Swiss-Prot record:
CDD domains: PRTases_typeI
Any one Pfam family match given in the protein's UniProt record, by short name: Pribosyltran
Protein name as it appears in the record: Adenine phosphoribosyltransferase
Family, similarity comment: Belongs to the purine/pyrimidine phosphoribosyltransferase family.
One cellular-component annotation, GO: cytoplasm
Keyword set includes Glycosyltransferase: yes
Keywords linked to the UniProt accession: Cytoplasm, Glycosyltransferase, Purine salvage, Transferase
Membrane-spanning parts: none
Catalysed conversion reaction: AMP + diphosphate = 5-phospho-alpha-D-ribose 1-diphosphate + adenine
EC number: 2.4.2.7
Organism the protein comes from: Shewanella piezotolerans (strain WP3 / JCM 13877)
Length: 183
């Protein structure tokens, strides 16, 4: 499976844009429409598998909640474990947490303390890169547990929101299958 312009265009075209959601002036990129299209969904996972299959990852970490939809099938296809990063109080075993800043306020993410070890080479997966706060916090969680993380994959990137710039200092190789301009 080759990451060519036709494949990437099919993925991008399967993502619906919803104007003025969740508030006026926002163009919401709805990745759930991609999930409704089995050809686009399968192609998305297939392209990620092809890109990462020879890189020696031992775990895929997906962020709540749509990162699960791409991270879990990717991990399954790569034959490695999947680790969820969730909002507080959603994981049953002992966790560590990391807070991060949002446009208005802050949020917190958690991971099980025994989910990542210093032997793990981790790929982080989410549906969307916007401001980069979620991925920054996720990478900090993984590194705090001793995991090696230098790659993050996204279906969508919104470069105008500054996520790539925010993550420049984190020594991450970023892959986005498609970009959309604007907010």
């Amino acid at each position: 499976m080759v990451m060519n312009t036709d494949s990437l265009a099919l993925i991008k075209n399967s993502i619906k844009t919803i104007p003025d959601y969740p508030k006026e002036g926002i163009l919401f990129r709805d990745v759930t429409s991609l999930l409704e299209d089995p050809q686009a969904y399968k192609l998305t996972i297939g392209l990620l598998v092809e890109h990462y299959k020879e890189q020696g990852f031992t775990k895929v970490v997906g962020t709540e909640a749509r990162g699960f939809l791409f991270g879990a099938p990717l991990a399954l296809e790569l034959g490695i474990g999947f680790v969820p990063v969730r909002k507080p109080g959603k994981l049953p075993r002992e966790t560590i947490s990391e807070s991060y800043e949002l446009e208005y306020g802050h949020d917190v993410l958690e991971i099980h303390v025994d989910a990542i070890t210093k032997e793990d080479k981790v790929l982080v997966v989410d549906d969307l890169l916007a401001t980069g706060g979620t991925i920054e916090a996720t990478v900090k969680l993984i590194r705090n547990l001793g995991g090696q993380v230098n790659h993050a994959a996204f279906v969508i990137s919104l470069p105008d929101l500054g996520g790539e710039k925010r993550l420049e200092t984190m020594d991450l190789e970023l892959l986005s299958l498609c970009e959309f301009e604007g907010e």
